[in-house]
Amino acid sequence: MRRRTSPRRTTTSKPQPIGPIQTFEVDGLTHEAKGVARLQGKVTFIEGALPGETVEAQVNKAGRRFDEAVLVNIIEPSVYRVEPSCQHFNLCGGCSFQHLANEQQLSAKADWLQGQLRNLITTQELETLSDTPTGYRRRARLAIDIKKGRMVLGFRGKASKEIISIDQCVVLTPNLQSTFLLLKLKLLENDLAGVLGHVELLEDTKGVSALFRLTSPISDELKNAWEDWAEKGRVALYWQAPKVGKAEVALEKMRYYDLGDLRLKYHPQDFIQVNAAMNQKMVVQAMDWLNPSKQDVILDLFCGVGNFSLPLAVHAQAVIGVEVQETMVEAARENARVNGFDNLSFVAADLTKPVNNELFKQTITKVLLDPPRAGAFEFLDSIIKIGPTQILYVSCNASTLARDAEYLVAKGYRVLRVSLMDMFPQTSHVETMMLLQKKK
């Protein structure tokens, strides 16, 4: 006998159903974790449905090429469907895969990544790097809203701008979860209502910090009261005033995190990887693949505060890091100094434009790049001109990685290894590492 269940639905801010309830056989999954079904030859995307399921759904957005539908009932569930570990999953927009078993999440991501890189790799070539699926996130940006005169702290909802008030987040580290609950209780006093834009919570080796981004100035009295709260809760508090790029430090200056035997300093607004365990594994894998030696001069593009640069410098003859953010370059130089490196140089440069620097005129044997989502297409010709024997590309956007890698292959490189890195379990996000070798 077929089982029938009724999933909890999301916010009413979504488009309302416009068609009758219909039965669908789901045979695929999109990168956004929507089930793919076909009815009378037309594709329908159903949020919350999984491959292999028979469901009832109601179209709420009709298009010329495809429809989108609301899941009403699950008639026959997938064997891989699991109960979400978070009570807010059906409302909160933070996670998209909690209803799918962890091993199948990886399988779905691998299928999607192979599709993106179909012109570059075969199915057998894709490796996987993963760690614990919950309690991993050491950084979170929390949204603020006012409802019925009270401040609401949470995340944006699924496919909506509504702020969902949450009581727990299973992907946050335990220390961030505890700080979140303390902060939520403190905000009930409403003394920051209308002036607090959002909050960033962050955990590192030094402890927990909170960055408050203000929409207008506050009094010294109010600021002191919050600093007292932070001190009691052992939270380092930072303020960012309106239209000021650099954080105004309330209690402490720079933060730091440990990476193996190395200690890296950074400012609280600087980019660092949110998954500490996966960052460690990623760096170890990068060292293994690139295999730096005392014969290597390595160029580290989009280097940040030196997350790859310093580990590379342990083994290489020299490492040159390039980063557009001046504050991160300053932090990277400080990291080289305090960790005792004299073979590290850092350059502040915009890699979307030609870079003229004496450091680039020496023989560079290998290149590592970790660009933003837009990729590094503008700088590829410069890399090709440098002529490194190997290029290690770390990507947070598989589509731009595919574009850039196909260009490099056309210019004389070949793909040696590719790894899916599950940096964000319970979400559809995919990180990728690719090693390319110059053809002889």
Curated annotation (Swiss-Prot):
The active site is at 396 (nucleophile). Residues 1-21 are annotated as: Disordered. Its EC number is 2.1.1.190. GO terms for biological process: rRNA base methylation. GO terms for molecular function: 4 iron, 4 sulfur cluster binding; iron ion binding; RNA binding; rRNA (uridine-C5-)-methyltransferase activity. Residues 15-73 form the TRAM domain. It catalyses: uridine(1939) in 23S rRNA + S-adenosyl-L-methionine = 5-methyluridine(1939) in 23S rRNA + S-adenosyl-L-homocysteine + H(+). [4Fe-4S] cluster binds at residues 86, 92, 95, 169. The keyword Glycoprotein does not apply. S-adenosyl-L-methionine binds at residues 273, 302, 307, 323, 350, 370. The keyword Metal-binding applies. Keywords: 4Fe-4S, Iron, Iron-sulfur, Metal-binding, Methyltransferase, rRNA processing, S-adenosyl-L-methionine, Transferase. PROSITE patterns: SAM_MT_RNA_M5U, TRAM, TRMA_1, TRMA_2. InterPro entries: 23S_rRNA_MeTrfase_RlmD (IPR001566), MeTrfase_TrmA_AS (IPR030390), MeTrfase_TrmA_CS (IPR030391), NA-bd_OB-fold (IPR012340), SAM-dependent_MTases_sf (IPR029063), TRAM_dom (IPR002792), U5_MeTrfase_fam (IPR010280). Belongs to the class I-like SAM-binding methyltransferase superfamily. RNA M5U methyltransferase family. RlmD subfamily. Catalyzes the formation of 5-methyl-uridine at position 1939 (m5U1939) in 23S rRNA. This is 23S rRNA (uracil(1939)-C(5))-methyltransferase RlmD. It comes from Marinomonas sp. (strain MWYL1).
